[in-house]
């Protein structure tokens, strides 16, 4: 039987055609793979969520000793007798080196210890605490310590914005009259930088001094009448004015026009 002889030029042509076809197929597959990978990355990026920031901390993170004390919310140096302790927040007493003449009263803290990070509100001073230390009420002690027995633990804390959704409150001290002015600020989102009063519609402002042992703002002497405008300057520099604030009704918190 005669064999069919194929010329070498045809064999070479078919071999070359096969190589070209394979290269095109491989290149197409690689391109498809990269396109798919790029699309996957875009989809993952679009589906990612960003955690909402609570705002920057208002102090550096402080390391110190955490101790326990039997807090009585309304009778500490901050005298929050008419402002209930915010739900979910522990009462914290601040060491004297961070007391700042009661400026930290009502400040919100994030406190971190062996049990995790939890929130508290400054309601008292702790003269017996070592520098940078804080006293914790029973609830926040058990949270921060991880249910340890009362004692001393290592903690880290920082002042953070409270983010209350309501305006801050002004409350007058027992004994006020048109001849004696004494105002407490409650529920501020951040510590205040200053509190001022105007008795002439804002033409001039009288600075009030915060009393370090009672958390009340008072003028240098005398009273400022029955009503006045009150200007708040927050620690951030934000300012707002509340018109015609009652200065003589005792222990009846009234809302301001805004919050820090």
Regions found by a protein language model. Give the residues of each.
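Mature exported/compartmentalized surface modules and terminal targeting/interaction regions
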Residues: 2-107, 116-118, 123-132, 139-260
């Amino acid at each position: 039987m005669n064999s069919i002889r194929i010329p070498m030029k045809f064999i070479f042509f078919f071999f070359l055609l096969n190589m070209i076809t394979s290269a095109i197929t491989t290149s197409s597959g690689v391109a498809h793979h990269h396109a798919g990978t790029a699309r996957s990355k875009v989809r993952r990026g679009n589906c990612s969520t960003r955690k909402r920031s609570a705002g920057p901390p208002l102090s550096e993170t402080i390391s110190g000793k955490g101790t326990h004390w039997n807090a009585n919310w309304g009778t500490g140096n901050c005298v929050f007798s008419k402002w209930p302790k915010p739900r979910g927040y522990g009462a914290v007493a601040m060491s004297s080196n961070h007391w700042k003449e009661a400026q930290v009263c009502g400040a919100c803290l994030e406190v971190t210890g062996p049990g995790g990070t939890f929130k508290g509100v400054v309601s008292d001073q702790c003269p017996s605490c070592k520098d940078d230390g804080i006293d914790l009420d029973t609830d926040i002690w058990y949270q921060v310590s991880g249910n340890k027995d009362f004692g001393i633990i290592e903690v880290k804390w920082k002042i953070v914005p409270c983010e209350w959704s309501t305006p801050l409150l002004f409350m007058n001290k027992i004994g006020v009259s048109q001849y004696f002015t004494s105002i407490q600020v409650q529920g501020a989102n951040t510590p205040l930088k200053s509190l001022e009063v105007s008795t002439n519609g804002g033409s001039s402002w009288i600075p009030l001094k915060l009393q370090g042992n009672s958390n009340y703002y008072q003028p240098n002497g005398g009273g400022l009448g029955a009503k006045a405008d009150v200007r708040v300057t927050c620690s951030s520099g934000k300012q707002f004015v509340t018109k015609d604030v009652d200065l003589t009704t005792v222990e009846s918190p009234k809302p301001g026009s805004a919050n820090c």
